[in-house]
Structures are given as structure tokens and as C-alpha cells.
Amino acid sequence: MKFFVDSANIEEIQELQNLNLVDGVTTNPSLILKSGRNILEVTKEICTLVVHGPVSAEVAATEFEDIMKEAAVLANIADNICIKLPLTFDGLKACKALTAQGLKTNLTLCFSANQALLAAKAGATFISPFVGRLDDYGINGSDLLHEIRTIYNNYSFETQILAASIRTINHVKEAALSGADVATIPPTILKALIKHPLTEKGLQSFLEDWKKTGQNIA
């Protein structure tokens, strides 16, 4: 399973990249706003940090012709750009056209298995089901991941399932259990995966016992 960082903050991405925990990056208009940076400038900088992984940059347009124009600008930033598109009629149309051009695409804001099926038919590189946002509406987001996995396996679709809207460490576990290809994770959640109270308690116990031995390793 691959881990993408859901962030447009250079410092956050760099810190995780140094631990070899980053397989890619996803951004969206909200994250760009939070960064306070120009989308083209910050996206180019991110692409230099994650040379071997895709970086999703989202169009702001909603009409086909405008989507294609913005996609051309974003695709020109770097070879590892993945064009993020809304899961709408025009978004699907653009996905088909961009895929034909050999560009990577990420259809976002997926909330149903039917939408995911259409994304695969359109040749999307990634489909982004929003797990946490479904949970907010009282719908189990992990169930959607399982449904999409089943459909994609049934028909050998190559579109990768990119679990998005990850709010908790449990969402990451659910994504892995469902067979999602990728989870895009906020930096705070990714770091939280490392922690467990029993690990910390056990380490403290070992350190206390080690002091009692009076030894030094180096």
C-alpha cells in the first residue's frame, strides 16, 4: 500500500520524505489556500521533493474546455503531475481526453461505487473516495472502499483506489484492509500511526532497566 501526503506545506512534506514515507502527494484548493502560496509555484516545489511519485494538482474549472486549459498548464509543471478532476460529467469527459494524451488523472470527490465505476471506464489513474466525509453523514466510508475494490477486481480495472478524506488512524487501517492501493494522509495522522501507548510504556521500562545495568554500548 502506498502512502501519499495530503498537504501543500513544503516543510511537512520534506520531513516525511526524509523518512522515506512518501510515495506521492495530493493537494486541493483548500490546502493551497492554507499554504498561502501560488499554486504553480508551490506545486513545482513539491514536485522537486517527490521526484518518483505522483503529485495531484487540482483544476478549479468545471466546464470541459476550461478544465482542459487548466490541465495543460498544470501538466507543464513537471512530468510527475497528476491532474485532479471533479467527478462530474465534464470531469469524466476531461479524464478520458487527458488519459488519451498520456497524462495521469485523479477523479476526486467520489461518494458512490457507481461514480467509481464511471471513473474506471473513463480511464482514471486514481479514484479518490472520501472516507471521512461519508462518515460525517453517518455512512461507513470503509464500506465504499470494499465495494469499489470488488467492482474493480471483477472487471480487472487498472484504476487505483486512493482512499481520501482520512481523519483518523483507524481510517488508514480500514483502507488497508479494504485493499485500497493508496491512502492519502494528513501529516498529523501519518505521524500518529507510529504511536501506541504500550510501545511508549515498554520503551520506558527498557530504558530504566538499561540504566540499572551501568553499561554503555558506544
Swiss-Prot record:
Q: Which domain of life is it from?
A: Bacteria
Entry EC no(s): 2.2.1.2
* Localisation per UniProt entry: Cytoplasm
Does the keyword Transferase belong to this entry? yes
Q: Name one GO cellular component term.
A: cytoplasm
Q: Which UniProt keywords apply?
A: Cytoplasm, Pentose shunt, Schiff base, Transferase
Q: Which InterPro entries match?
A: Aldolase_TIM, TAL/FSA, Transaldolase_3B, Transaldolase_3B/F6P_aldolase, Transaldolase_AS, TSA/FSA_arc/bac
Q: Which SUPFAM superfamilies match?
A: Aldolase
> Would I find Transferase among this entry's keywords?
yes
Name its pathway: Carbohydrate degradation; pentose phosphate pathway; D-glyceraldehyde 3-phosphate and beta-D-fructose 6-phosphate from D-ribose 5-phosphate and D-xylulose 5-phosphate (non-oxidative stage): step 2/3
> What are the positions of the active site?
K84 (schiff-base intermediate with substrate)
Q: Which reaction does it catalyse?
A: D-sedoheptulose 7-phosphate + D-glyceraldehyde 3-phosphate = D-erythrose 4-phosphate + beta-D-fructose 6-phosphate
The main enzyme category here is transferase
| GO molecular function terms attached to this record | aldehyde-lyase activity; transaldolase activity
Per the UniProt entry, what are the Gene Ontology biological process annotations, in alphabetical order? carbohydrate metabolic process; pentose-phosphate shunt
Identify its protein family: Belongs to the transaldolase family. Type 3B subfamily.
Please explain the role this protein plays, according to its UniProt record: Transaldolase is important for the balance of metabolites in the pentose-phosphate pathway.
Name of the protein this chain belongs to: Probable transaldolase
The gene from which this protein is expressed is tal
